Amino acid sequence: MTERMKKIIFKNLIISETEDYIIINKPPGISSLHDWSSETTIITMAKEYTEDPQLCHRLDKDTSGILVIAKNPEAYRNLAMQFEKRSVEKIYHAVVEGIQDIEPIAIDRPIYTMSKGKVRIDFQQGKPASTLVKPGEFFKKHTLMLCKPVTGRTHQIRIHLSSLEMPIVGDEMYGGKQLYLSSLKKK
């Protein structure tokens, strides 16, 4: 466990809380569910905070964003059904390399899961995957892309953007380079 993970206090992640749900801002670098490489996960921290927490959805370990945790089985079923029926609109923001002045597109490329959680585009063995993508804002050497996954495959947005030579900055697993704040100047 890194020093950074030791310092995370679950209560400080909470954006909103009701009798049924806890809404948190998940930081990058921590798994939502159990992870063989780390004992600290969002769900283990939530179990110390409330009696019966259940994740209504998940975010990849290195992804930050809003995460909803149900406090009881009925609340979980209610929101899980909304996710299953795709009535929840999910939009991810990703800073990618280069100026991507493109029209909105649908990336339809099948994804195959390899060992150790990495994925690749594979037209023979992959499972169908679709992501809607459009540019949001332009910087000097980067573009903020707005991404809406139609399917929910592991690392879907990361591999789809990388497959079009638009790797997410900092995502070294799929070809992204480290980002320095000085390079995020407005175009």
Which residue stretches match the model-derived regions?
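RNA pseudouridine synthases
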Residues: 1-130, 136-139, 161, 182-184
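Beta-strand-rich interaction surfaces with strong enrichment in secreted/lumenal proteins
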Residues: 134-135, 146
